[in-house]
Structure formats: C-alpha cells, structure tokens
Amino acid sequence: HSLGEAATAPMAIPFGEVSLPGYFIPAEGGKNEVRPLIIFTNGYDGTIVDTYFACAVAASRRGYHSLLFDGPGQGAMLYERGTALRPDWEVVIKAVVDFAEGLPLVDTRRIALSGWSLGGYLAPRAASGEPRISALIADPGLWSIADGFRDFVVRNLGVSPDAAADLGKLDEAVMRK
C-alpha cells in the first residue's frame, strides 16, 4: 500500500470564535462506508503531519477513519495563530466530537480518542468528561513529566540541577490529589 491511497480531506472544526485545522482520513477500502472513527490528538510540539504518519496511516490500513486536528497551543494553532495550550482539553474534544458527529461516514457509537505525547495526558482528562468517546488510547511517552523535563530545564532554562531534582515532587503531589 502506498501512503497516497488514503485520501485526506481538510476540515475546519468550529471552536468558539476560531476553527481548528484538521483532516479527515478515510479507512482504506471503506472510504464511502460508515466506519469507527479515531480522533487523534497530538502533543505539545506535535503537528497534524506528525500524527498523520505516526498514527492515521496505520489506522486507515486497519479499517478506521481518522480525524486529526491541531488544538489550541499545538501545531498551526500555536505557530500560525499564536493560541496558547489549555488544560481543559475536554472542552476542545467536545467541539471535535460535535464536529465528528456531523460527518456522514462516522459511526457515532464507535468514536475513539487517541492521545500521543502530551496528548496522552490530555486525552484521558478529555475522555472522562465526554460520554460519546467509546474507547481511549493514551500514549504519553513518559511515565513522569518531571523526568522528561529535568535535563531540559537545566540545559535551556538555567535551572540548577538541585532545583531540577525537585521536579519529581510535582508528580507526587499530582498523584495524591
């Protein structure tokens, strides 16, 4: 199969006063059939293009339609429109699911949400507040956000190694809540 077989359709997903850039990728062999949908949400520094190659092509080859988007603070929304990342991802996903339900090829009883990288942290929160999500895939890439940021903050932000060592307390505090 070539990557070109999965035709993409650009979408503008309404979100408040703006629209989120997105793409609908139909399932291979089922581009005109109602099928389950996987909504893919990327990470902090990810883009729709990354998600297409890392996730949507494989989903399409396995019979799933895919909906990719850049949310606030991600990809084009960050780099071209200057929007900030927001923690209440359930608000973002509600708008994306509202949009997906209007697509004629989507089996609205079988909508999954997949989060990758930082999206792997945002997706569970979003799914917990969105009853129309029937399945969740969380792939955060890190067991601990603090572990991933220690070297970064020392190297790029001038934080002392001793102070960076305390970042683990952040994970502990979050887990106690």
Outline where the language-model segments fall.
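Residue in the alpha/beta-hydrolase core beta-strand immediately N-terminal to the catalytic nucleophile
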Residues: 70, 110-112, 135-137
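Aromatic pocket-lining residues of Rossmann-like dinucleotide-binding sites
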Residues: 59, 126-127
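Gly/Ala-rich beta-loop-alpha elbow adjacent to hydrolase catalytic centers
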Residues: 115-119, 123
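Accessory, usually C-terminal, subdomains that scaffold auxiliary metal cofactors
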Residues: 52, 73-90, 116
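Short substrate-entry loop that stabilizes the transition state in hydrolases
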Residues: 30-35, 40-78
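N-terminal cap/lid segment of alpha/beta-hydrolase-fold proteins
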Residues: 1-36
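Alpha/beta-hydrolase active-site loop
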Residues: 83-109, 125
